[in-house]
């Protein structure tokens, strides 16, 4: 997988908004020879949901650089003859496999889309409002009331791509990681004799007998990466999913003087990023052995083994010496770890229910004086009622006033000092107070 730096984006923020539910309809049956037909207002359709879907054909998050807002379709309003409005179309947003989805405000991890086809709902659509056919009773046979649709959910999300690879190559810049991955796999990264040639992670598939695994070439780290020196440690997140870390060390002495020090500097930067990385299995790859004498090489390899307490495999990415042993070792470790990993049970995706807030029967009311002779009735749960119904509809007003009276509205108005003739506002509806 070769991607230009400008095309590789592994962290973005996007805004998602699910569709609102359609409004219910106030309608009455009108047919020839049926002079007084009953209510037949249909329900509104549900708003569309927003889903994220892991798509293996998507490699980076670059599609979200220029487009950051995604909105699903609203539900259609209900109609007469008990016709339900059409549901809004769900919106599916494809992201790379390995994308971690977080709430951008709280930082909560919503989902880890680490398998092809995995889906997560990130915003639920609002339920459609009920038409007046639902409000008919033996006493009220022609109700002038219908519900508004519920608002769909909205939120800011942070998408973070963590590449899925079995082996992660880490080390200083210019130690030969790119040459190594091009030697052992089908990857063909840019290779040059200067630091930071690799600016993005490169992936390569390695085949060993009947077994294959994926290796990631992580851009070089240097001392101070955790403070943003060089390319920083922004790419270390791609190592988090690897089974095995292959720590590449330049033992030639031409560009790096002390391979043991180099090893521990990189380990310290990994620790600062996440101590969890130090718990991963690791082998040390001593590269560029073609540039050093055999006797000197043996001394360096012994120092590395004694200091790191790791298996050290000497190789030359240029001549190919030691490559077969390295591939065999990597394949053996990865194969063993994949067998040990318990099989995941396939999770069947179930679409959640649309947003629908239950109307509270009892709630606190507050009467606020806005001007001389002008008062406003407020309350958190009162707002839910006001959003649910159109108070221009006669029966909606009567129903709400009955609920408010049960919650002591009249006493609240008197306690606040409302006088006869004063104007009281509830939502967008105003009325003149009478004792």
Curated annotation (Swiss-Prot):
Residue numbers binding GTP: 171-178, 196-200, 217-220, 287-290, 316-318
Xref: CDD domains: Obg
Name of the protein: GTPase Obg
HAMAP family according to UniProt: GTPase_Obg
Function: An essential GTPase which binds GTP, GDP and possibly (p)ppGpp with moderate affinity, with high nucleotide exchange rates and a fairly low GTP hydrolysis rate. Plays a role in control of the cell cycle, stress response, ribosome biogenesis and in those bacteria that undergo differentiation, in morphogenesis control.
Binding site for Mg(2+): 178, 198
Keyword Nucleotide-binding assigned: yes
Family indicated by similarity: Belongs to the TRAFAC class OBG-HflX-like GTPase superfamily. OBG GTPase family.
Organism: Thermotoga maritima (strain ATCC 43589 / DSM 3109 / JCM 10099 / NBRC 100826 / MSB8)
UniProt record, GO biological process: ribosome biogenesis
